[in-house]
Amino acid sequence: MTRNIGLKVKEPKRECEDKNCPFHGELAIRGKLFDGKVTGSKAKQTITLQKDAPVYFNKFKRYARGKSSIHAHVPGCIDVESGDNVLTAECRPISKSVSYVVVEVRS
């Protein structure tokens, strides 16, 4: 049985026993949502995302490409590979560098 997490996303088909899953565990979603591209998925239940955002330089009156990398937790009920576009949501800190959780795989 899946929990309503308050977002209009597709629920995963499988169930998991992960306590840090927003659908089947006790993890609450709060704060920011963003799309990102998975650049690394070698760690256990953790991925690295690249977030692209334009940065405005007032001196030149132009935008430049800005990039930042963020670590996110992957619940056991969601399959993610490198190169996928995913939707992540902010949550409480799971570890030192992980404060986001994957909610949906977009492609």
From Swiss-Prot:
Q: What does this protein do?
A: One of the primary rRNA binding proteins, it binds specifically to the 5'-end of 16S ribosomal RNA.
The species this protein was found in: Nitrosopumilus maritimus (strain SCM1)
What Gene Ontology molecular-function terms does this entry list? Answer: rRNA binding; structural constituent of ribosome
A GO term from the CC aspect: cytosolic small ribosomal subunit
Complex formation: Part of the 30S ribosomal subunit.
Q: Name one Pfam family in it.
A: Ribosomal_S17
InterPro entries per record: NA-bd_OB-fold, Ribosomal_uS17, Ribosomal_uS17_arc/euk, Ribosomal_uS17_archaeal
CDD domains tied to this protein: Ribosomal_uS17
Q: Which family does the record assign?
A: Belongs to the universal ribosomal protein uS17 family.
The record, for NCBIfam families, names: PRK08572.1 (NF006345), uS17_arch (TIGR03630)
The record, for Gene3D superfamilies, names: 2.40.50.1000
Q: What is this protein called?
A: Small ribosomal subunit protein uS17
The gene behind this protein is rps17
GO terms (BP aspect) = translation
Q: Which UniProt keywords apply?
A: Ribonucleoprotein, Ribosomal protein, RNA-binding, rRNA-binding
- Top-rank taxon: Archaea
Q: State the HAMAP family in the record.
A: Ribosomal_uS17_A (MF_01345_A)
